[in-house]
Each structure stands twice: as structure tokens, then as C-alpha cells.
Amino acid sequence: MNCLFCKIAENKNERLTIFEDDMVVVIMDKFPICDGHLLVISKNHYETIMDVPNDVLTHMFDVAKKYALIDMKVLNETGCSFSINYGTKQEIKHLHLHVMPNYNVKPSKNVEEVYKLIMEGLNEEEKKI
């Protein structure tokens, strides 16, 4: 399979990983539309939200909620948007959930700087990926 997100889920060296378990991986978006823009990516390949089993989708949102709270805390934000694109808006045909604190503000930091802030904000248990 020639799927970018399948490759990302398999290769830890090419991404800024925030969290990983047996169902999902959370990474910094390579092309963020705001500071702290995260992607929660299903490890198994599901092309759309219509294809994913409910337990995986529920888990994706549970993980997104947890890391959105951390993201907002370290960036001093008060709000967050969650988004799953479907159909013509879906650029990569692999299910992923966007987590975007303060969605209306353009990025002011580089991805590595925000990654460092988030990782510093995690407690020791959460750092054990």
C-alpha cells in the first residue's frame, strides 16, 4: 500500500510523535494551520470515517480530547477545534482527526518548538510512548 499515513504509523523516525498505542498515533501536523495542530491517525488503514469501527473512532476522540487539553494548557489557549474531513475535503485517504487549538490564529511558532512545549507539558507516565 502506498498510503502516507500507513507509512507514518510504521516509521517512528519521520515524525514528531506525541503519543502512540495499538490503535492510534498522535503527531504534530507537518503543515500546521495553527500552533499545536495535531493529527490523531488510526494505525489500521480506514479510508474514511464511514469505514472505521466505532471502537476505533471512540478511541480516537478519547485520545484527541486528552491531548487537546494538554495542547491548550501549554499554549495558553482556551478553545480547540476537532475536524475529520470526508469526501472532496479529504486530501489523504486515511482516517485522521485534526486537533487545532485556537483554530483562527495562524502559526507563530515552528512545529519543533511547539512539539518541545507539548512534550515538556506531559507528565512522566504520558512520556512513555
What residue spans do the PLM features occupy?
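HIT superfamily nucleotide-processing domains
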Residues: M1-I129
